[in-house]
Amino acid sequence: MERKFRVSAGAIIIRGDEILLVRAKNSDGNDFLVGPGGGVESDEGINQACIREVREETGIEIRPYKILFVEDLVWQNKRVVKIWFLCNVIGGELTRTQGAIEEGLIEARWFRKDQLKNEIVFPAVIIGYNWGSFIEDNWKTQYLGIENSAFDL
């Protein structure tokens, strides 16, 4: 079986003690939270894809400035390598955009860590970290290994 392969960009956006996440549904109809992001188009860089996807899904303008994680996901006949960037907000206004509606996203909003206790969150690794540590200069990019995706890629 031939696998479809794609590269994707995701945004980790921290504001004080909050993180910006979007709520989506998987193919089973269960909802989950994930950092905004999506596939890289053939004519753009990974950082440009991150900027575009965040704008399309949230209305927020960002600047990616550090790679935090590299995620390697498998789902049926698909494989996605996702680069997670730490991003600064530089403009825009959080809104439910037309792009988000078309993608089936339910909401985009800021969450405190205590609000995520009973939620399914991707990348799951972010729950275990002090989000302030992402900003530190000595942060080393982490490869998260190959995982089966919990949702359709």
Language model regions located:
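Short connector loops at helix/strand junctions that flank enzyme active sites
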Residues: 6, 14, 28, 35, ...
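Conserved N-terminal beta-strand and adjoining loop/helix that marks the start
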Residues: 1-19, 70
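Conserved S-adenosyl-L-methionine
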Residues: 65-69
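Charged phosphate-binding loop/patch that engages nucleotide di/tri-phosphates or the phosphate backbone
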Residues: 128-153
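Unchanged
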Residues: 40-63, 73-122, 151-153
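Conserved Nudix-box catalytic region and its N-terminal flanking loop in Nudix hydrolases
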Residues: 18-56
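A beta-strand edge to alpha-helix "cap/lid" segment located at domain peripheries
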Residues: 2, 121-124
